[in-house]
C-alpha cells in the first residue's frame, strides 16, 4: 500500500512510531499484536502500556448444532450464540464484582449488522436500531451497545464481547468475496490469508479498555 511503501514510492520519509497506549492492557495488545504482526507486509511495531489485567481474553463456546425447541438449526444456533453472550455478560459482572468496580460500558461486536438482529430474535436481547443500544433482557440496566467491527473504529469501551467468531461465509473472518469491480481501484493484500479480516479483528480486540470476551462454536 502507499503507507507501507511510502518512502519507496515518494522518496525520503521518516517513520515515527507511536508505541505507547493507555486504552488497552499490555496483555491485550500483546495478544492482538502477535496476531496482526504475522502479516509480513505490516509495519513492525510493539505497543507498550502501563495497564495490566488478569484474564485479558476469555473465550465462550456454544453448540452450533443446537436445534432449539422447534427443531430449526439456524434459529437454534442463534439462540445458542445469544445464550453464550449472556453467559459472557454474567462472567464480566463477576469480574467487576471481584474487582469492586462498576460494570461500565459493554460493546457487543459483530462482523455484520444483522448479527445484532439475530440476537434480538432469540428473545434474550432487545435491539431496535442498528449501531445503537442493545438491551439484555436478564440484565436490563447494563449499558450495552451493538456495533459492527467496521463501525467501531476509533472508539473505546470498558469491555468488549465479539459475538461472531465462526468459520462460515458470514462469520468472522468473513469469507464474502469482494465485488470484482473493486479490484480496479483497490489493490488486495495477498500477503497472508484474510489480511483485511485480520486487521479488522485487531480493531475489534483493541476497542476494549479491559477484557475481550469471544463467542465461538465448539
Where in the sequence are the language-model features?
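Conserved nucleotide-binding/hydrolysis micro-motifs of P-loop NTPases
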Residues: 1, 21-26, 64-66, 113-115, ...
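Conserved RecA-like helicase ATPase core segment
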Residues: 1-66
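Conserved catalytic network of the ASCE P-loop NTPase/AAA+ motor domain
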Residues: 7-10, 52, 99, 139, ...
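Short glycine-/polar-rich loops that comprise or flank the Walker A/P-loop
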Residues: 10-15, 54-57, 142-144, 155-159, ...
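Structural preference for long, well-ordered alpha-helical segments in enzyme cores
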Residues: 18, 31-32, 85-89, 201
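Helical mechanochemical/support elements of P-loop NTPase systems and associated helical scaffolds
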Residues: 24-25, 77, 81, 115, ...
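Conserved helicase/translocase motor-coupling segment
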Residues: 64-155
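Conserved helicase C-terminal RecA-like lobe
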Residues: 102-105, 150-206, 210-217
Amino acid at each position: 500500500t502507499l503507507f507501507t511503501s511510502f518512502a519507496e514510492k515518494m522518496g525520503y520519509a521518516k517513520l515515527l512510531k507511536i508505541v505507547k497506549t493507555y486504552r488497552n492492557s499490555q496483555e491485550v495488545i500483546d495478544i492482538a499484536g502477535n496476531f496482526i504482526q504475522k502479516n509480513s507486509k505490516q509495519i513492525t511495531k510493539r505497543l507498550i502500556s502501563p495497564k495490566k489485567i488478569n484474564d485479558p481474553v476469555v473465550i465462550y463456546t456454544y453448540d452450533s448444532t443446537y436445534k432449539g425447541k422447534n427443531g430449526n438449526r439456524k434459529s437454534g444456533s442463534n439462540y445458542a450464540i445469544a445464550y453464550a453472550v449472556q453467559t459472557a455478560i454474567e462472567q464480566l459482572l463477576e469480574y467487576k464484582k471481584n474487582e469492586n468496580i462498576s460494570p461500565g460500558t459493554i460493546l457487543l461486536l459483530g462482523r455484520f449488522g444483522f448479527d445484532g438482529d439475530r440476537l434480538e430474535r432469540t428473545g434474550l436481547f432487545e435491539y431496535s436500531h442498528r449501531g445503537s443500544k442493545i438491551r439484555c433482557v436478564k440484565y436490563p440496566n447494563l449499558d450495552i451497545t451493538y456495533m459492527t467491527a467496521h463501525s467501531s473504529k476509533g472508539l473505546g469501551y470498558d469491555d468488549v464481547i465479539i459475538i461472531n467468531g465462526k468459520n462460515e461465509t458470514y462469520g468472522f473472518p468473513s469469507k464474502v468475496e469482494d465485488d470484482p469491480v473493486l479490484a480496479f481501484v483497490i489493490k488486495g493484500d495477498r500477503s497472508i490469508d484474510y489480511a483485511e479480516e485480520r486487521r479488522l479483528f485487531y480493531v475489534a480486540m483493541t476497542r476494549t479498555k479491559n477484557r475481550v470476551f469471544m463467542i465461538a462454536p465448539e
